[in-house]
Amino acid sequence: MATNAKPVYKRILLKLSGEALQGSEGFGIDASILDRMAQEIKELVELGIQVGVVIGGGNLFRGAGLAKAGMNRVVGDHMGMLATVMNGLAMRDALHRAYVNARLMSAIPLNGVCDNYSWAEAISLLRNNRVVILSAGTGNPFFTTDSAACLRGIEIEADVVLKATKVDGVFTADPAKDPSATMYEQLTYGEVLDKELKVMDLAAFTLARDHKLPIRVFNMNKPGALRRVVMGEKEGTLITE
């Protein structure tokens, strides 16, 4: 199989959904999936790629149901941020067990648990080939973890945001509901907006577009997909200018 000898990206921002960590379980963290993801991230580090990671929290907390019951949105979002910290702690531990140097940073201060987010420190760690896990979203309510991924991706000057999902890429329709749906290999930001394709929420997507930050959507459940993406092979959907 012909592959590039060297990775096409030097620094990436990997966005993992919380749901990806729960595996076939309906809730929580599947240890085997966590360890597999840690091994795939380790492969990237061994290729010399600098890796920032943003993880969602949907496997541990879902605010929608409580919001319907009357919970304040700000409170729900704060709980969601803490869920991402819990996932970050689990990922840091899995990386350490895989002998990968990793640092967990939080956008909200949690002294004694993890470091406070510092842009300068994050850049320094990445340059020294440390995996940096960026948790607690943006630190503000009303912003999704996709927004956090794009914001941090821009801040750390990542070459791309790699959005790991449960499907192979961006499709013409929901492949779970429409068997005739086909996958796009490449799209422009404008095409995504015109076709109203579900890539990420509008705030996150326009942030990436305005800063010309490429997004690649791929299936994290497919073994080796992450490596294929960084080696420039055909995998997932690329969204650029």
Curated annotation (Swiss-Prot):
<feature type="binding site">
    <location>
        <position position="62"/>
    </location>
    <ligand>
        <name>ATP</name>
    </ligand>
</feature>
<feature type="region of interest" description="Involved in allosteric activation by GTP">
    <location>
        <begin position="23"/>
        <end position="28"/>
    </location>
</feature>
<dbReference type="InterPro" id="IPR011817">
    <property type="entry name" value="Uridylate_kinase"/>
</dbReference>
<dbReference type="Pfam" id="PF00696">
    <property type="entry name" value="AA_kinase"/>
</dbReference>
<feature type="binding site">
    <location>
        <position position="174"/>
    </location>
    <ligand>
        <name>ATP</name>
    </ligand>
</feature>
<comment type="function">
    <text>Catalyzes the reversible phosphorylation of UMP to UDP.</text>
</comment>
<feature type="binding site">
    <location>
        <position position="58"/>
    </location>
    <ligand>
        <name>ATP</name>
    </ligand>
</feature>
<keyword id="KW-0067">ATP-binding</keyword>
<dbReference type="GO" id="GO:0006225">
    <property type="term" value="P:UDP biosynthetic process"/>
</dbReference>
<keyword id="KW-0418">Kinase</keyword>
<feature type="binding site">
    <location>
        <position position="171"/>
    </location>
    <ligand>
        <name>ATP</name>
    </ligand>
</feature>
<dbReference type="GO" id="GO:0044210">
    <property type="term" value="P:'de novo' CTP biosynthetic process"/>
</dbReference>
<dbReference type="InterPro" id="IPR015963">
    <property type="entry name" value="Uridylate_kinase_bac"/>
</dbReference>
<keyword id="KW-0021">Allosteric enzyme</keyword>
<feature type="binding site">
    <location>
        <begin position="138"/>
        <end position="145"/>
    </location>
    <ligand>
        <name>UMP</name>
    </ligand>
</feature>
<dbReference type="GO" id="GO:0005524">
    <property type="term" value="F:ATP binding"/>
</dbReference>
<comment type="subunit">
    <text>Homohexamer.</text>
</comment>
<keyword id="KW-0665">Pyrimidine biosynthesis</keyword>
<dbReference type="GO" id="GO:0033862">
    <property type="term" value="F:UMP kinase activity"/>
</dbReference>
<feature type="binding site">
    <location>
        <position position="57"/>
    </location>
    <ligand>
        <name>UMP</name>
    </ligand>
</feature>
<keyword id="KW-0963">Cytoplasm</keyword>
<feature type="binding site">
    <location>
        <position position="77"/>
    </location>
    <ligand>
        <name>UMP</name>
    </ligand>
</feature>
<comment type="similarity">
    <text>Belongs to the UMP kinase family.</text>
</comment>
<comment type="pathway">
    <text>Pyrimidine metabolism; CTP biosynthesis via de novo pathway; UDP from UMP (UMPK route): step 1/1.</text>
</comment>
<feature type="binding site">
    <location>
        <position position="165"/>
    </location>
    <ligand>
        <name>ATP</name>
    </ligand>
</feature>
<keyword id="KW-0808">Transferase</keyword>
<keyword id="KW-0547">Nucleotide-binding</keyword>
<dbReference type="GO" id="GO:0005829">
    <property type="term" value="C:cytosol"/>
</dbReference>
<dbReference type="InterPro" id="IPR001048">
    <property type="entry name" value="Asp/Glu/Uridylate_kinase"/>
</dbReference>
<dbReference type="InterPro" id="IPR036393">
    <property type="entry name" value="AceGlu_kinase-like_sf"/>
</dbReference>
<protein>
    <recommendedName>
        <fullName>Uridylate kinase</fullName>
        <ecNumber>2.7.4.22</ecNumber>
    </recommendedName>
</protein>
<feature type="binding site">
    <location>
        <begin position="15"/>
        <end position="18"/>
    </location>
    <ligand>
        <name>ATP</name>
    </ligand>
</feature>
